[in-house]
Amino acid sequence: MRLATWNVNSVRARVARTVEFAVREHIDVLAMQEIKCKTEQFPYAAFEEAGYHVVAHGLNQWNGVAIASREPIEDVEIGFPGMPGFEKGKEGPDLPKEARAIGATIDGVRVWSLYVPNGRGLDDPHYRYKLDWLEALRRHTEDTLAANPGLPLALTGDFNIAPTDADNGDPTVIEGVTTHVSPPERAAFAAFESAGLTDVVRPLIPTGYTYWDYKQLRFPRNEGLRIDFILGSTAFADAVQGAEIHRNERKGEVPSDHVPVVADLDFSHGEDDDDLPMIFG
């Protein structure tokens, strides 16, 4: 399985580029974030013509998530249990849920496409919402793996957190001043490791960014952030054979400000030897 995650920053504006990437790179599963359209406005036909099944969840011109797959998509889940909502200027348990999470099972692998709240500012209510959202996701992850420890599970997407100083090359992103690098955000990200997940790309690609702001020549100066991740359970991580960060997708006409992150997986190595092909020297 070749799995990719990409914050496409408006799928309708970049549908040709997104589909072309998926086909060219032989992507089996593509998790997309910031599709920026309602569910019914998603360009399903372009993906289907290229041989993909698609599920999407969008409410308006903001946020939105989707999963495209070569294989059938099963057990689709919109949002996760305990996921908080948000509405500016309001508090309480019944706030509207944003289009930030969609999960599905593909060939026995549970995949989530996630667009974590930005946080906006350290003194903004959106920052508290971000931390609450991450905590709810962590609890759901723990519950899922406690019920099925051998499940190949992947949390993929834009986490809006640079977990280490090496993941921050943007001079305007400063600890104590801006979001994405605050100790509480980094602790929330690290908590997924305690929940049983591993950043499956970092051991193979220890450095490099996945996002560069459109402003102030951030990309030519390579002043980016590493905020897009594939976090996998033990059963998922053990199957990872390779990884890629497609920096060139930030080039060209009307690029997204994010680039795709790819993991190559082979689940057959866990099968009985009798089921594996024999190779003779």
What are these regions (language model features)?
Residues M1-S10, G108-D123, H258:
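Active-site-proximal beta-strand elements of phosphoester/diester hydrolases
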Residues R110-Y129, D170-R186:
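Active-site-proximal loop/helix segment associated with metal-binding centers of metalloenzymes
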